Every structure is written in C-alpha cells, then in structure tokens.
Amino acid sequence: MKIDELRTPCYVIDEGKLTENLLILNGVMQRTGARILLAQKAFSAFYEYPLIGRYLSGTTASGLFEARLAHEEMGKENHVFCPAFLPQEMDELVEICDHIVFNSVSQYLLHRDKIEKADKKISVGLRINPECSTQEGHEIYDPCAPGSRLGITREALDKAIKNGLDLSRIEGFHFHTLCEQDSDALETTLAAVEEKFGDLLYGLKWLNMGGGHHITRADYDIERLEKCIMHMRDKYDLEIYLEPGEAVALDAGYLETTVLDIVENNGIKILILDTSAACHMPDVLEMPYRPPLMDSGEPGEKKYTYRLSSCTCLAGDVLGDYS
C-alpha cells in the first residue's frame, strides 16, 4: 500500500530505521555490558515488541497497564516506576515485574510486605534526586527543578535512615533527569550522583540512569556515554541500566494527515487537518515544540506559508507555521 492510499490520521512506522536505532543501542550494550530497556511511555507500538526484544534487554513501565503490556507482548525484563502505586495494583505488579522502583521511602514501606511475600524475587529500587538540573528551555520536563516531586533527595534519605530505614533490602538506585540530551549532561549528572550518593552506591547491585539519552541522534557522543557507563560499572561494581524512549524510535516513523479545509484570518492561511496536536502529538503543546514537516521550510522561506491546525474545538490546538 502506498502512503497516499492510507486512511488518515495514521502513524506509519519505518522498520528499517527502527532496526538501525536498535542496532546502535545494542552496540552500546555489547561494548559496555549495560542493559538497555524500552521506555514504553515514549513508544508502545507492541506489534514491534518482538523486533525490539531481539536487541534490547526488556522494557520499563510507568504504571500497571504498560507493565502488563510488556509482560504479554515482549516477555523480557519488566521494570516499573510510578510516583505512587495504588495498593490494589501492587498485587498484579509483583506477579509480572522483575524490578519495582519507588519514588519515596513511604511508598516503599507501604508496599514492602507484598513484595516480600511475592512468589518470585523482585529487585527493589529507590528513585533518587541528585538535585542537578541540566535542562534549559523546557523546565516542565526537569525532574530536578526546585520543589520537584520526583525522586528522593539525600537529605530526605538520610532522615529516613536515621529513622530506621533498612537499606540492605534496596538493590538499586534509579535517576531520570535528562530530556533529549547528549552524554555531556549525563556526565554532569553522574558527578552530582557520586557527590551526593556515592557512599551508598557501593552497597547496591544496580544503577538505572533513566531515559532522556538521545543515543541514536546523529551527533550524539556515544563514546562519552560508554565511558560514563564503564566508570560507574567498574568503580562501584554495579550493573548499569538505561531506559531510552525516544531514542528507540527516533525518526523511525511519520504521522500521515489530510487537509480537510483552508480558512483565512488576518491574512493567515490556516489548514484544518484531520489530526490534532492535543491528541496525536501532545508534546507540541506541552513542551512546546514545532514538529518537522516533510519537505517544508520556515514561514516565508517558500512561496506559500500556512498555519497547520486541527479539527478539534481547542483554539490553541495548532502545530505551527510552515512554508
């Protein structure tokens, strides 16, 4: 079937490019011994899970339903993190997950009994907050922003230890501080992790460096990434995990859409599409950013300039201006 024969709106996945990305990620795994997981919140096209599972170690989930999807469709390592878990969800999570990461000490203590009574061994981790911001321009995605709810600061962890927390049952630490960044930001973050939590790393089995690593981007510094991985692996005798999302599927697909109408207001020609930023590309509004459009230019660069918008009733549901 040709692209112009597809019913729209429609996501089209380029398996060739997806495989190229997976080969890059698998190369990092082979050279460093790190285990790389698919972050399903970024890409959950489960039809591709058998392909992804041939190259990566497993998946990470942001809740019960993603964890269930990974369990059913990939069947490899199944990690889950959520800022707070519902007690009734934990009953199923302990059956289908291998690693469960808690956002706070109180969450760990709340669910500890179910984990210890589970029929299988579950590796428990805590999400830490190294309080090291490396992002500029999109603070909405910065887990280290002042007052962040994500991760445990060293001050909070020390208080819990003083109050009797037994860290011997915690096998790993997890941090996720990056967003579409290069490995220099990881290097900066690791320096903060070592400064604040280094003394505790020696007693752990694994360290999960989270996502936000743009590993498959053409200009990404993979050599620096691998040095970071091997430094933490060798110094602290840790198994290292990474959980990229966008890097798995970067540039490996398209959103096909159809122009339904053209309206004009104040000299602006506006295309009404059968797609929506709010529904199909929420980051366009939340980040915000201007998604690339095939064969287009900046406004005014080419002969015709249009504003791309949607058929929803949200006035601000606009993708951007293109020529």
Language-model region placement:
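Generic N-terminal amphipathic, Lys/Arg-enriched alpha-helix
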Residues: M1-V12
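A non-catalytic, amphipathic alpha-helix used as a structural packing/dimerization or gating element
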Residues: G16-I24, A192
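Short, glycine-/Ser/Thr-/acidic-enriched flexible segments
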Residues: K17, F43, E66, Q107, ...
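A short, N-terminal amphipathic alpha-helix
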Residues: N21-R31, L69
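Active-site-proximal beta-alpha core segment in soluble small-molecule metabolic enzymes
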Residues: A34-W206, C228-H231, I272
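Glycine-rich beta-strand-to-loop/alpha-helix junction loops that act as flexible
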Residues: A39, T177-L178, L207-T216, P244-E246
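Charged helix-capping and loop-helix junction motifs
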Residues: E187-A192, D221-K227, T257, S323
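Charged (often Lys/Glu-rich) extended helix/loop segments that serve as interaction or gating elements
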Residues: C228, E239, P244-S323
